[in-house]
Amino acid sequence: MNKIIPAILATDISDLELKVAQIPDEVKLVHIDILEKDIYTDIDIDFEAHIMTKEPDKFASLWVERGAKGVIVHKLSENILHLKNRTKLGLGIEFNVPLEEMLPSIAKVDFIHLMSIAQMGEQGHPFESGIFDRIKKVREKFPQVEISVDGGINTDNYQKLLDLGVNKLVVGSGFKKLWNSLTKK
């Protein structure tokens, strides 16, 4: 179950607190989506921060200071690469970005975070089945790299992702249904 990570996209602090409170006790890590609005309060669970802002340098450092166990960015810079000394650094790759453009950067990070939806920043978008080929390509070139996949994951597709060697499944709107299907057996 450590492979299934709930994604939280909060609109304000009370929404963040409410969503964290709804996470099952067995979950040890949450994934917080960070948009342009800075929403933060102390939470009682380990978290990683997915930085989807225009100024990733500023926000990535801030979330590392707040205790993020991992930070995911979509653009690498020297400032961000230095964060690797303080937390796990992930490279987010949007679904519509050609993998070939990002391959040189993969060796510089601790893990890659492949988006499996066409549009980031909102939950509930449909799963893009083309992610399966993207995972295979990454595995061929980087057999040891940790891979997380984010977006549209549900009871119909999660097992195939795990079978392809995905290390973490980041699940937003479908988390409760997937979690319940796996824990209520």
Identify the meaning behind each predicted range.
Residues K3-I8, V30-I32, D46-I51, K69-V73, ...:
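Hydrophobic faces of well-ordered beta-strands that scaffold small-molecule active sites
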Residues K3-L18, I39, L62, R66, ...:
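A structural preference for long, well-packed, hydrophobic secondary-structure segments
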Residues T11-A21, D25, H31-K84:
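N-terminal active-site wall of soluble small-molecule enzyme domains
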Residues L18-I23, D57-E65, N96-K108, G152-L169:
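Catalytic cores of alpha/beta
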Residues D38-T53, I80-F95, S129-G151, K185:
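Alpha-helix-loop-beta-strand connector modules within alpha/beta enzyme cores
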Residues V71, K75-N79, H113-G124, L162-K185:
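Glycine-rich phosphate-binding active-site loops on the catalytic face of alpha/beta enzymes
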Residues F95, M102-F142, L178-K185:
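Glycine/Thr-rich beta-alpha phosphate-binding loop at enzyme active sites
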